[in-house]
Amino acid sequence: MVQRLKSIYLNNVIPKLNEEAKYKNVHQIPRLKKIVINCGIGEASQNAKTLEYTIRDLSIIAGQRPLVKRAKKAIASFQLRKKMPVGVSVTLRGDAMYAFLDRLINLALPRIRDFQGLNRKSFDGHGNFHLGLKEQLMFPEIDYDKIDKLRGMDICIVTTCTNDNECFQFLSALGMPFQTVSSKKL
């Protein structure tokens, strides 16, 4: 079964982008490479259950088990020892990537309070888009009664685009809600 967002990409986005940019080769048309979700857990040194809860929440959100990131060296001022867990990360590709992005665009982002759209300055100059979320409750899979603490996460959407403008056009065509540019300056 083809994911809904992937079928939109194949049937609507590719012809639209090809018409606008007049690509000479089909491999030049922008596409998604991967989505990386990262969640830092600095307080894991004081509370051992924090790692367990973070892995559970990220597994529910992403649909696959995250990888535990460990400290490479000890830093005494942070009470950090070598090989102590400092974060969890999951990389989504293929259908899981399209399913997650579809849920992010259509379910999670509209549930943010006072959401005005995603910041247009969050592109990195190489055709990738980064966004940070302050809490995991915006995803409908997370049960409010089962969380121990509000935890944020970083999401990196990696594309084959070569510049920020091309990536903006591509993600807008996929349905990402970006902030509108107002004509008056404050």
From Swiss-Prot:
Keywords: Chloroplast, Plastid, Ribonucleoprotein, Ribosomal protein, RNA-binding, rRNA-binding
Keyword Acetylation in record: no
Compartment annotation: Plastid, Chloroplast
Keyword Glycoprotein included in the entry's annotation: no
GO biological process, one term: translation
SUPFAM superfamilies per UniProt: RL5-like (SSF55282)
GO molecular function annotations of the record: rRNA binding; structural constituent of ribosome
Superkingdom of origin organism: Eukaryota
GO annotation, cellular component aspect: chloroplast; ribonucleoprotein complex; ribosome
Function: Binds 5S rRNA, forms part of the central protuberance of the 50S subunit.
Family per similarity comment: Belongs to the universal ribosomal protein uL5 family.
UniProt cross-references to NCBIfam families, sorted A to Z: PRK00010.1
Subunit structure: Part of the 50S ribosomal subunit; contacts the 5S rRNA.
Name the UniProt record assigns to this protein: Large ribosomal subunit protein uL5c
Lineage: Eukaryota, Viridiplantae, Streptophyta, Coleochaetophyceae, Coleochaetales
